[in-house]
Design a protein with these regions (language model features):
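C-terminal accessory module of base-excision DNA glycosylases/AP lyases that mediates lesion recognition
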Residues: 2-127
Length: 127
């Protein structure tokens, strides 16, 4: 499934946010965390709870994983939980800012500030 088509379906109201994440997870190699990252970067919604964030907030990584046999109902529940968790932790903007700040602190020779981290990611996207 094409990412841009899926994003268009969401923006036009054809699908809701949990289904957007589920459809993005149909792309090989994409799970909820990366789907949340795609939504964060393209729509300013959800967020990316990568391994660093999961550890920081004490969340088990398997909580948001799908397998080949995961039913739609379970995927939907996990997607809803993922969205709710991101919101509970402060939302997309807060998670982005905190992640950029952490990355800048962990890699001071690569990044001058959290703003530099953010700018590099925007540059990669052509934004």
């Amino acid at each position: 499934r094409d990412i841009f088509l899926t994003l268009h379906e969401y923006k036009s109201g054809e699908i809701d946010l949990p289904d957007l994440l589920i459809r993005l997870c149909d792309i090989p190699g994409i799970q909820l965390v990366k789907a949340g990252f795609i939504a964060q970067l393209t729509l300013g919604k959800v967020g990316c709870l990568d391994i660093h964030n999961l550890r920081m907030y004490g969340i088990n990584a398997s909580t948001f994983k799908f397998t080949d046999t995961t039913t739609y109902a379970t995927k939907r529940k996990k997607a809803e939980l993922y969205i709710a968790t991101c919101e509970r932790l402060g939302g997309s903007e807060y998670l982005w800012d905190a992640w950029c700040e952490n990355l800048a602190e962990c890699h001071p020779t690569k990044f001058t500030s959290k703003h530099h981290v953010s700018r590099v990611h925007c540059d990669y996207l052509g934004a």
